[in-house]
Amino acid sequence: MFSENIGNDYIVIQEGTSEGTQVKYKKDGYWYKKDNRGNEGRAEYLVSKFMQFTTLQENEFISYEEGTINGKSGCRSKNFLDEEEELVTFYRLYYNEVGKDLSKVIANMNTMEERIEYVIRFIDQSCGLNIHAYLSKVLTLDMICLNEDRHLNNLALIMRGNDFYCLLYTSPSPRDGA
């Protein structure tokens, strides 16, 4: 377990999800997230430990440590992005490309299958990336871990130059809202 005191100058983002807002920091090669409701950090740590015992490769997910941040429970992960990489959420990619809110667009579709296929088709057309396997892994993990907070701001691609690739990670943190 770690214990870290971090000043407000390291705060990266304070964005809400349907489960609430959590303070996120980036310092010395780590991303930190303080618990908001209690035990979110422990959940992320346990899920990342669980993933070590699956058939996933180490480069497909983020490992978390649990600890304390400014005396409050939370978690941290090593920064998973290289200098020339950027995390782009599905929401932001769609907004940048189309100028509309992807969640509102798919909310008007009749079935979940239509919504998923629309997103898959958009990512393929925009990035040349087939995300079927990625979504299958993320949604399977969500089902196993009872994650009910999956949305378009915590599904993301890593962009390096003009290339995109997927990384399975355990939860919205610390990239939520990126």
Per-region residue spans from a language model:
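Short, well-structured alpha-helical interface segments that form or flank functional binding sites
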Residues: R42, L46, N130, R150-L152, ...
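Single conserved hydrophobic/aromatic residue that forms the stacking wall/gate
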Residues: Y169-A178
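ATP-dependent phospho-/nucleotidyl transfer catalytic cores
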Residues: F80-L139
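Conserved ATP-binding subdomain of kinase catalytic cores across diverse folds
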Residues: M1-G99
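Active-site catalytic microenvironments for nucleophilic, acid-base chemistry
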Residues: F50-T54, I158, S173
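Hydrophobic, aromatic-enriched interface-forming segments
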Residues: L135-L168
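Short, charged/polar micro-motifs that form catalytic or ligand-binding hotspots
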Residues: K34-G41, N130, Y134, L141, ...
